Amino acid sequence: MTKIIQISDPHIVAEGKLAYGQVDTSSALKQCVAQINKILPDIGPVDMIIVTGDLTDFGTSDEYNLFREIIEELNIPYRAIPGNHDNKSVMQKCFEDTDWMPKIGPINWEIDFQDLKVIALDTSIIGTAHGNLETASLNFLRSALNSAKEKPVIVATHHPPVMTGIEKMDIQNLRDSDELKEILSTYKGELKLICGHIHRNIVTQFGNVICQIAPGVSHAVTIDLREGSPNCLTKEPGNFLLHEIRDGILTHQIPVDDYDGPYLFYPE
């Protein structure tokens, strides 16, 4: 029964700095790591952590090194894909010692478990906030799905290919997604698409597959569905997702912050 934790959009900045002058993203990721370590006996074993983009805020080597220093306090294998805030070439250099980071080209990878296949796709474009999938990435997806042999599949991207109603984020989402939808629709087994970027837990349909957008671990994009609304963040509690194979792909949301309990409903 494979279990995957999804962490999204940590936005690590230089130590001692605040993202957007407001958010201590390093402390938030440290708290996320502490929370996972704390509850691991209750939810584990966890097979892998996937970070769905925006590991850093400015894509510097110092930020990536700090990200690694924090995330590697977990004794769980992890992999990542870039988001629009990441610098692909710097990211590749900072993770060149790992067995999953491609040396050149899009940062795509796949991994097979006994009852699940995870396919991760690079949607980032240097110099732009919105996402797109290169032909090489679409071909990578086709090949990976062909080898999945109808076992459950999770496909991960940073940019979601759906509209959320949050106008300033929707213009930054994945563009030209029709080919992605067509490829996913041909898969005969169960398939779930997981994304980041929006910093909110949103579930919708993309063609014939479920698409789930993960919340951020440190801050949220403000939910403002009015036309012309400003692009804002709110300091909502951070969360991460746990995906597991249990009569299909099941997803739990877990808060980053510490909390009281557990308490018996009916203590003796």
Regions found by a protein language model. Give the residues of each.
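N-terminal active-site segment of His-dependent metallophosphoesterases
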Residues: 1-66, 106
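Active-site-proximal beta-strand elements of phosphoester/diester hydrolases
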Residues: 2-14, 115-125, 154-156, 209-215, ...
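Active-site neighborhood of phospho(di)ester-bond hydrolases with catalytic His/Asp-centered motifs
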Residues: 6-8, 48-54, 78-84, 122, ...
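Active-site environment of divalent metal-dependent phosphoester hydrolases
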Residues: 13-15, 57-62, 84-91, 126-129, ...
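Short glycine-enriched, charge-decorated loop/helix-capping segments at active-site entrances
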Residues: 18-24, 97, 127, 166-173, ...
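Binuclear metal-dependent phosphoesterase catalytic core
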Residues: 26, 30, 35, 183-185, ...
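His/acidic metal-ligating clusters that form di-metal
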Residues: 32-48, 130-210, 241-242, 249-250, ...
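Extended active-site neighborhood of metal-dependent phosphoesterases/phosphodiesterases
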Residues: 61-143, 176-189, 229-245, 250
